[in-house]
Curated annotation (Swiss-Prot):
Single annotated GO MF: lyase activity
UniProt protein name: Cholesterol ring-cleaving hydrolase IpdA subunit
Keyword Lipid biosynthesis in record: no
Disruption phenotype: IpdAB double deletion mutant does not grow on cholesterol or HIP, but grows as the wild-type on pyruvate. In the presence of cholesterol, ipdAB double deletion mutant accumulates COCHEA-CoA.
Substrates-to-products reaction catalysed: (3E)-2-(2-carboxylatoethyl)-3-methyl-6-oxocyclohex-1-ene-1-carboxyl-CoA + H2O = 6-methyl-3,7-dioxodecanedioyl-CoA
Enzyme class: lyase
Domain of life: Bacteria
InterPro entries per the UniProt record, alphabetical: CoA_trans_fam_I (IPR004165), NagB/RpiA_transferase-like (IPR037171)
EC number(s) stated in the UniProt entry for this protein: 4.1.99.-
PANTHER family per record: KETOACID-COENZYME A TRANSFERASE, SUCCINYL-COA:3-KETOACID COENZYME A TRANSFERASE SUBUNIT B-RELATED
Subunit relationships: Heterotetramer composed of 2 IpdA subunits and 2 IpdB subunits.
Pathway: Steroid metabolism; cholesterol degradation
Job of this protein: Involved in the final steps of cholesterol and steroid degradation. Opens the last steroid ring of cholesterol by catalyzing the hydrolysis of (3E)-2-(2-carboxylatoethyl)-3-methyl-6-oxocyclohex-1-ene-1-carboxyl-CoA (COCHEA-CoA) to 6-methyl-3,7-dioxodecanedioyl-CoA (MeDODA-CoA).
Amino acid sequence: MVSKRDKRISLDDAVGELRSGMTIGIGGWGSRRKPMALVRALLRSDVTDLTVVTYGGPDLGLLCSAGKVTKAYYGFVSLDSAPFYDPWFAKARTAGEIAVREMDEGMVKCGLEAAAARLPFLPIRAGLGSDVRRFWGDELRTVTSPYPDASGKSETLIAMPALNLDAALVHLNLGDKHGNAAYTGVDPYFDDLYCAAAEKRFVSVERVVETEELVKTVPLQNLILNRMMVDGVVEAPNGAHFTLAGDSYGRDEKFQRHYAESAKTPQAWQQFVATYLSGSEDDYQAAVKKFAEEQA
């Protein structure tokens, strides 16, 4: 019998599989269960010129702060709590430093579904009653249904292009060494779709456990990734910080506000980078622990 592959790797090994110019999908939702440890590893790398597909939050903001992003496809970008709009994404967008493809949230899902099904596009009504088509120009087109309705009219729909990903980065709560992974809490977001739409798939988890423990700990419906959907598993405790991570921990609101405040001046941001983003993931976690103690 062939044994199942052990897919455990380090953060830097995962990012080492990425290349400049790639299109990457980042799972989670706003400031919720983002693969922040993988994002921080990406910040430490030489990878740049990225196209990012995301329901965005500080993941996209941090990558913009380091000049890593050339283009972004997103349904929204939010910190979910005050000040709500990510400061670094806002700066990059208003300064024209990145090309943006803003769209209805359902259009992102539709584009990922098309990519997962290896289809060039899928039809959708979302976007028809907005300026999305004008913003996208020739990149977004319509299609006429070949099936007339009861009145004999053929409906015009958005032909949402597949959001094909070179790589997907997601964070879940529990996983095994083979790539099976599950979330805890109330929402799967669309992490499974990101992985299904990507050529390379990397999941960070709060804990790597034995398969037997994994299937006993969570309901079957929470087990959204199976080993065929994952190429690398990274054990990263607190790896979604400062975003929330289901039942593992809530959003670090004080640190998120510190992040946003630090973006207001070059001096403050330089200090933030020196303190939190210039070392290893262990260095980051130690600095975050010190910050929490000082704020207590």
